[in-house]
Amino acid sequence: MRCWVWLLVAIVLCQQLSVVRVLAAKKERKKGKDPHQFTEPFNVSLSNSEELHETDKLSETPDPGLPDAYTTWLGFVGRTDDGANSKKKCKGKDKKLRGLFGPPGPPGPQGPPGPPGMPGAEVTYEVLLQDFKQMLKEATERRLMSGDIPEHTSELPPIVLPVEDLSPYRRVDEGFHCRLKGQVIVDKKTLVELQNFQMPTAKGSFLRGSGLNLATGRFTASVPGIYQFSAHVHIDHSEIKSKAQLRPRDNVRVLICIESMCHRYTSLEVIAGLESNSKIFTVHVQGLLQLQVGQYTSIFVDNSAGAPITVQNGSDFMGILMGL
């Protein structure tokens, strides 16, 4: 055991002595340098002979200040902190470099299409018209509340059309189409009002409004305006042709009159002669009449011949409101 102790003491002393020698050698080198001594720069060019002579001197004179292996190891151990610091610096630089971002990459491929959506609501013409009316009403109310409408103006106000006139097709409020239900005999020199009509059973006929009275054959206007009326009256005059010779003044008149006053009010009138070779002929009358609320129109047949005539069933009477 004592031998080991003495061995450790000897090793420690040797280390201390070597350190002292190294320090002494460094001091001697510092003292041996002359501050006024001139040294040539390292890159001064020499001749070949001078270079060989200098290299021989360097090889012959060993440098007393060259450290041994132990001194080199101590110097390396003393610089371990510098290595750690350099690693820290490198780590800091790496972090800074990692903070930089490159340009964005190209867009990826398009994904698959999604599922189809729910079917939209069916929008009809009536719904669109109702929405437009509501929007127009709200805009008018906002303008009235904001006071943008001037109180006095010298110009005439613009004509404001109703919303129904803005639509491409106008609804027919008043109109009818009816036919005579049975035959009507008109005696000679007699004016008769046609009555007892009926609606056609076939598709295509129409009746709008409540102004038509089928029993009396009269149409009463519930809206003032201009109406268009037409009538197709089928007349059978076979009895006249068989009994007597026709006279030039023998004719038949078909009229559409207002309030049954064909001479006081404007009426629609057609005069047809009885010289036709056919047994039945048709008299057609058509035109426009202006009616006020409560006024009615009807068909009259005036027979000026010397024998009775017969108005056939199926004769038409039609009318429609054209405008106010």
Swiss-Prot record:
Single GO BP term: regulation of D-glucose import
Region feature (Disordered): 28-66, 83-121
**Skewed-composition ranges (Basic residues):** 86-98
Which InterPro entries does the entry link to?
A: Adipolin/Erythroferrone-rel, C1q_dom, Tumour_necrosis_fac-like_dom
Q: Where in the cell is it found?
A: Secreted
Its predominant location is secreted
The answer to whether the entry has keyword Magnesium is: no
Mention any one GO cellular component term assigned to this protein in its UniProt record. Answer: extracellular region
Q: What subunit structure does UniProt give?
A: Homomultimer; disulfide-linked.
Instruction: Spell out the protein name for this chain.
Output: Adipolin
Instruction: Mark out the compositionally biased spans (Pro residues).
Output: 103-118
This molecule's function is given as: Insulin-sensitizing adipocyte-secreted protein (adipokine) that regulates glucose metabolism in liver and adipose tissue.
Q: Which UniProt keywords apply?
A: Disulfide bond, Glycoprotein, Hormone, Secreted, Signal
- Glycosylation positions in this chain: 43
Q: Which intervals carry biased composition (Polar residues)?
A: 40-49
Keyword Signal on this protein? Answer: yes
Q: Signal peptide: which range, if any?
A: 1-24
Organism listed in the record: Xenopus tropicalis
Domain C1q: start-end pairs:
169-324
Give the UniProt family note: Belongs to the adipolin/erythroferrone family.
Q: Name one GO molecular function term.
A: hormone activity
In this chain, composition skew of type Basic and acidic residues spans 50-60
- Enumerate the PROSITE patterns for this protein: C1Q
